[in-house]
Swiss-Prot record:
Family that this chain belongs to: Belongs to the alpha-ketoglutarate dehydrogenase family.
UniProt name for this protein: 2-oxoglutarate dehydrogenase-like, mitochondrial
Keyword Zinc-finger: no
Top EC class for this record: oxidoreductase
Keyword Heme tagged: no
Assembly description: The OGDHC complex comprises multiple copies of three catalytic enzyme components, the 2-oxoglutarate dehydrogenase (OGDH/E1), the dihydrolipoamide dehydrogenase (DLST/E2) and the dihydrolipoamide dehydrogenase (DLD/E3). OGDHL/E1-like isoenzyme may replace OGDH in the OGDHC complex in the brain. The presence of either ODGH/E1 or ODGHL/E1-like isoenzyme in the complex may depend on its tissular distribution.
Named cofactor requirement(s): thiamine diphosphate; Mg(2+)
Binding-site positions, Mg(2+): D398, N431, I433
UniProt source species: Pongo abelii
Residues given in the record as thiamine diphosphate binding sites: R299, D398, N431, I433, Q663
Length: 1010
């Protein structure tokens, strides 16, 4: 049988040769064709998959499942395959056709009719969604494609298109194995075939799945939707659905009555989303899911919090009270952005389930990769490699789903090994409008969901005014995700009963649509009338259900009036229980020394300079690098790459998970890291030495990302949310490219704690340095990060005992520019040893990675050593500070240029150079000490960046606060410019020489006023 599996590649040519000679047309193949086309053509009205292959595999499984003419043909073809005969024998039907012309004609007609029916079935499967009745308003087609399949409109059109006649409607036809409309029946009349196909594909559900290039997956979907009677619900299921609709609609009505002038972005017009989400959760819980992480925009968010996550109603209602003050630190956020974390019993499955709704900004779809990253992390911490315990649900708006590029970026993470969450259920609230924009002006694709086709995700469109259809589709979506570990999209085609918000007037821009909406009967009334008519519920029971929920809301409203303050921490989406306390008491504001024993440094270094696997051949160039590392270990020195290796390795020893992600991070953009070794003789055989340090170490993940900043940084941010006991780093290929992810930086990283009381310890590694490489490979834009830092330039702090750590606790993020590998080592370790978590922004070097002066001794990393916020002058100038004429402050790589120039001019005793390693929060205490140490010296700030960029605008007012404006801080650096760097090498060197000359010209500032 295995040999027969090779036949499909030859079937097209054989069919043409065997049958064309006898005037039996099959698939329109040309008799002169000597080989099959690149893709076997389908029958008329079909799609891209080979119909003949499907028939062939069906015959292999059961010869009686196909028509006898096909049985005969495949038998002859298989005999030829085994015998190797050059002249294939025709099928028996061909022998019979020779005996009589009438028999031949009859057989030809029989085959053609059966092929036509197969084609008709396939056409429905491929294109039935184009004519499905999806719009509750009946205004627009479900899609914006002007193409309407003429073969799927009327019975006459169908028959004519397939060369069938009305007399054929009552003929019985054998059903192919690619459909399940027959149920237990193998044959149906053409009339019944059409009726069942219409019911499956052209009513309130539109299915897009035939583009999926996996027969098993297509068959699974066909069976779920085509099998007769699959959408039958019990009375109890219908009553549950009605009760959920009542809660969804009455919640919105209650808010509208109590706070008619408040923005709440209600769900009216898509109330079915609440039972839809609950169905996905119920079904997933039934299949073993224990943790569901949701991301969604503002539309319907309060309803989801109340009726899906089950947030206490009084806490939601408190958010509408303008008189309540927040009890927590931070600025807070509007109510329809807040998140939530809740563990409860799922009433349907009677199992525990944890639900998280991730807080998000107004920037639509920005939360998508964050949710995926958090989901991936939760799966890791639960040992859930297959995604059977933790899953994500993403809710989208139609305009944003089609319009926001981060949706595409997130989809393309879905099947990458280090980023996959084993499938996400996407729910699109397709209200057919984007604020005021008509969908025909908002996208170029027929559907808002077409972006999902790039990852072969099935798309289930459904009319939101048919609650039972919605619930069934959502149940299937949950099953799909559990079965195939792939994404799936549910497109809820609905409408928006009010404007974009409750104060908005939609009639200005959509008059016809809103005239129809005003006439539209709410879905709750439609469904209640249906159930009452069929006797599932009585009118009295329905009214009692409404009264019951109204009473719940009123009671919660009364309790909300007793609240005196708001607690933002009650809306935390990612709590870290036990992290901020020790034995019930808050952790002290201290940080232990970050150095480690020398034997640990040596051990990590030896692993970093070797290959832990046998028979593993590495590149000769890499062998030189490893030998160089080994030499450094012998000499007790480290460069940048080794310092990073030692920081990571020591944390792994302490049980801290480390994850490094970004473009080309495995090797490193500048070929310095080499954390993944590649066997030069075995394809895709790799080794990560960092995972071979200790038997009981934590795992290390280093993964090259897709070529995305926005999506990947959002993912890593979400990953870091899940646990404080992990060092999660994202490295930009060049620091310049971080601005493609600016939304994540602005809306989540810099402001996340202030808005949502959510700590996060993510680390951003941003290669930065002016080296003549042009305006897009030079600057990580430090000025932008410093502008968003929240420390007060005019407030002179009190230097308490715990000032250093308290200052870190009060800031919104930490910004550093290390000039030594040792300090880089320490700041990475400090990030984990702090008693809290803050984002860490590190401007990392490029040329310093191999700079001979940027190698430092183990002595600066051993036990008892720590991160230096400021590195003072330690040369001749420091030994005679009273003779120093100028004190230059700087940060980062420019220090080495300054030291070289000072040496060349012999000014070591006249000019002191102090390095600012931690820029924000500003080290007021240490800078004050340095300035006072050199009372007779001019003070200057030197930077390689242009004056309107870099650090000067940040440090200058803080120096003035320290110095009480008694001494100026002069600027030394490049002039203001529009672009961050020149692309001309000569211009770069000229400007470098110019500001270095100024830095050491001791008369440069004479006669100038500050």
């Amino acid at each position: 049988m295995s040999q027969l599996r090779l036949l499909p590649s030859r079937l097209g040519a054989q069919a043409a040769r065997l049958l064309a000679a006898h005037d039996i047309p099959v698939f329109g193949w040309r008799s002169r064709s000597s080989r099959p086309p690149a893709t076997l053509p389908s029958s008329k009205g079909g799609g891209g998959s080979s119909y003949m292959e499907e028939m062939y595999f069906a015959w292999l499984e059961n010869p009686r499942s196909v028509h006898k003419s096909w049985d005969s043909f495949f038998r002859k073809a298989s005999e030829e395959a085994f015998s190797g005969s050059a002249q294939p024998r025709p099928p028996s039907v061909v022998h019979e056709s020779r005996s009589a012309v009438s028999s031949r004609t009859k057989t030809s007609k029989l085959v053609e009719d059966h092929l036509a029916v197969q084609s008709l079935i396939r056409a429905y499967q491929i294109r039935g969604h184009h004519v499905a009745q999806l719009d509750p308003l009946g205004i627009l087609d479900a899609d914006l494609d002007s193409f309407v399949p003429s073969d799927l409109i009327t019975t006459i059109d169908k028959l004519a298109f397939y060369d069938l006649q009305e007399a054929d409607l009552d003929k019985e036809f054998q059903l192919p194995t690619t459909t399940f409309i027959g149920g237990s029946e193998n044959t149906l009349s053409l009339r019944e075939i059409i009726r069942r196909l219409e019911n499956t594909y052209c009513q309130h559900i539109g299915l897009e799945f035939m583009f999926i290039n996996d027969v098993e997956q297509c068959q699974w979907i066909r069976q779920k939707f085509e099998t007769p009677g699959v959408m039958q619900f019990s009375s109890e299921e219908k009553r549950t659905l009605l009760a959920r609709l009542v809660r969804s609609m009455r919640f919105e009505d209650f808010l509208a009555r109590k706070w008619s002038s408040e923005k709440r972005f209600g769900l009216e017009g898509c109330e079915v989303m609440i039972p839809a989400l609950k169905t996905i959760i119920d079904k997933s819980s039934e299949m073993g899911i224990e943790n569901v992480i949701l991301g969604m925009p503002h539309r319907g968010r309060l309803n989801v919090l109340a009726n899906v996550i089950r947030k206490d109603l009084e806490q939601i209602f408190c958010q509408f009270d303008p008189k309540l003050e927040a009890a927590d630190e931070g600025s807070g956020d509007v109510k329809y952005h807040l998140g939530m974390y809740h563990e409860r019993i799922n009433r349907v499955t009677n199992r525990n389930i944890t639900l998280s709704l991730v807080a998000n900004p107004s920037h639509l779809e920005a939360v998508d990769p964050v949710v995926q990253g958090k989901t991936k992390a939760e799966q890791f911490y639960r040992g859930d490699a297959q995604g059977k315990k933790v899953m994500s649900i993403l809710v989208h708006g139609d305009a944003a789903f089609a319009g926001q590029g981060v949706v595409y970026e997130t989809f393309h993470l879905s099947d990458l090994p280090s980023y996959t969450t084993n499938g996400t259920v996407h729910v699109v609230v397709n209200n057919q409008i984007g604020f005021t924009t008509d969908p025909r002006m908002a996208r170029s694709s027929p559907y808002p969901t077409d972006v999902a086709r790039v990852v072969n995700a099935p798309i289930f469109h459904v009319n939101a005014d048919d609650p039972e259809a919605v619930i069934y589709v959502c149940s299937v979506a949950a099953e799909w995700r559990n079965t195939f570990n792939k994404d799936v999209v549910v497109d809820l085609v609905c409408y928006r009963r009010r404007g974009h918000n409750e104060m908005d007037e939609p009639m200005f821009t959509q008059p016809l649509m809103y005239k129809q909406i005003h006439r539209q009967v709410p879905v709750l009334k439609k469904y209640a009338d249906k159930l009452i008519a069929e006797g599932t519920v009585t009118l009295q029971e329905f009214e009692e259900e409404i009264a019951k929920y109204d009473r719940i809301c009123e009671e919660a409203y009364g309790r909300s009036k007793d609240k005196k303050i708001l607690h933002i921490k009650h809306w935390l989406d990612s709590p870290w229980p036990g992290f901020f306390n020790v034995d019930g008491e808050p952790k002290s504001m201290t940080c232990p020394a970050t150095g480690i024993p020398e034997d640990m440094l040596t051990h990590i270094g030896s692993v970093a300079s070797s290959v832990p696997l046998e028979d593993f051949k590495i590149h000769t160039g890499l062998s030189r690098i490893l030998r160089g590392r080994a030499d450094m270990i012998k000499n007790r020195t480290v460069d940048w790459a080794l310092a990073e290796y030692m920081a990571f390795g020591s944390l792994l020893k302490e049980g801290i998970r480390v994850r490094l992600s970004g473009q080309d991070v495995e090797r490193g953009t500048f070929s310095h890291r080499h954390h993944v070794l590649h066997d030069q003789e075995v394809d895709r055989r790799t080794c990560v030495p960092m995972n071979h340090l200790w038997p009981d170490q934590a795992p290390y993940t280093v993964c090259n990302s897709s070529l995305s900043e926005y999506g990947v940084l959002g993912f890593e941010l979400g990953y870091a949310m899940a646990s404080p006991n992990a060092l999660v780093l994202w490295e930009a290929q060049f620091g310049d490219f971080h601005n493609t992810a600016q939304c994540i930086i602005d809306q989540f990283i810099s402001t996340g704690q202030a808005k949502w009381v959510r700590h996060n310890g993510i680390v951003l590694l941003l290669p930065h340095g002016m080296e003549g490489m042009g305006p897009e490979h030079s600057s990580a834009r430090p000025e932008r990060f410093l502008q968003m830092s929240n420390d007060d330039s005019d407030a002179y702090p009190a230097f308490t005992k715990d000032f250093e750590v308290s200052q870190l606790y009060d800031c919104n993020w930490i910004v550093v520019n290390c000039s030594t590998p040792a300090n880089y080592f320490h700041v990475l370790r400090r990030q984990i040893l702090l008693p809290f978590r803050k984002p860490l922004i590190i401007f990392t070097p490029k040329s310093l990675l191999r700079h001979p002066e940027a190698k430092f001794s183990f002595d600066q990393m051993v036990s008892g050593t720590s991160f230096q916020r400021v590195i003072p002058e330690d040369g001749a100038a420091a030994r005679a500070p009273e003779q120093v004429r100028r004190l230059i402050f700087c940060t980062g790589k420019v220090y080495y240029d300054l030291v070289k120039e000072r040496s060349s001019q012999g000014l070591e005793e006249k000019v002191a150079i102090t390095r600012l390693e931690q820029i924000s929060p500003f080290p007021f205490d240490l800078i004050k000490q340095e300035a006072e140490k050199y009372p007779g010296a001019e003070l200057a700030w030197c930077q390689e960046e242009h004056k309107n960029m870099g650090y000067y605008d940040y440090i200058s007012p803080r120096f003035m606060t320290i110095l009480r404006r008694a001494r100026p801080i002069w600027y030394v650096g490049r002039d203001p410019a529009a672009a961050p760097a020149t692309g001309n090498r000569n211009t770069h060197l000229v400007s470098l020489k110019k500001f270095l000359d100024t830095a050491f010209n001791l008369q440069a500032f004479e006669g100038k006023t500050f």
